[in-house]
C-alpha cells in the first residue's frame, strides 16, 4: 500500500552556513564598522547582538536574506522581542522544527475534508499518509502545497509504493 510522510525539518548544516555568511557580511559592511555586532547559533536559536535597535533590524534582514539564499523557509523563524539596554541590543530568533499538535490536526482535518481516499495518522512529529493509489497520494501533496494558511514549511519524504 503506497504511503509517504509529511514532516517539517530544518537542515542544520544550511542554517550554520547562513549564520556564518551573515556574520561575514556584518563584519565587512560599512554601517557596522566599529560595532560589536555578531550572530550566534546554539542548537536552533540564533542570537543577534549589536549596539542599537536600528542595527538589530538590519541584522535581522541580513539573516533572513542569507537563510532564503540557503533554502531555509522564513516561516520556520520565530522572531522574539528585542532586549534593548543602554549600550547593547539583543534579539533571539528561534528556528522551529517538527509538526506540533495543532498544525498536525489542521493538516489531517484538511486531508479528511478533501474526500481523497487516503488515511492520515500522526506519528510523533510526522504524519503518515497511506492510500491505495499513488495518484491519491500525489493529490494530497498538491492539496497541502496549495494551502496558504500553514505557518510551517512542509516536506514530503519516505514515499513508498
Swiss-Prot record:
Record keyword Membrane present: no
Cystine bridges: none
CDD domains: YajQ_like (cd11740)
UniProt keyword Aminoacyl-tRNA synthetase, yes or no: no
Source species, domain of life: Bacteria
Transmembrane region(s): none
Protein family (similarity comment): Belongs to the YajQ family.
HAMAP family: YajQ
Protein name: Nucleotide-binding protein Tcr_1902
Annotated organism of origin: Hydrogenovibrio crunogenus (strain DSM 25203 / XCL-2)
Amino acid at each position: 500500500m503506497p504511503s509517504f510522510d509529511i514532516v517539517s525539518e530544518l537542515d542544520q548544516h544550511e542554517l550554520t552556513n547562513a549564520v556564518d555568511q551573515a556574520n561575514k557580511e556584518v563584519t565587512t559592511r560599512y554601517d557596522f564598522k566599529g560595532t560589536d555586532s555578531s550572530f550566534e547559533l546554539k542548537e536552533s536559536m540564533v542570537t543577534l547582538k549589536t549596539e542599537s535597535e536600528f542595527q538589530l533590524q538590519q541584522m535581522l534582514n541580513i539573516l533572513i536574506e542569507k537563510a532564503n539564499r540557503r533554502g531555509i523557509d522564513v516561516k520556520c523563524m520565530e522572531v522574539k522581542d528585542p532586549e534593548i539596554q543602554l549600550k547593547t541590543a539583543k534579539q533571539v530568533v528561534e528556528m522551529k522544527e517538527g509538526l506540533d499538535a495543532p498544525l498536525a490536526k489542521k493538516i489531517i482535518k484538511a486531508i479528511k475534508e478533501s474526500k481523497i481516499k487516503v488515511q492520515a495518522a500522526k506519528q510523533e512529529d510526522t504524519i503518515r499518509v497511506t492510500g491505495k493509489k499513488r495518484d491519491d497520494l500525489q493529490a494530497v501533496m498538491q492539496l497541502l502545497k496549495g494551502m496558504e494558511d500553514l505557518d510551517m514549511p512542509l516536506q514530503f519524504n519516505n514515499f513508498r509504493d
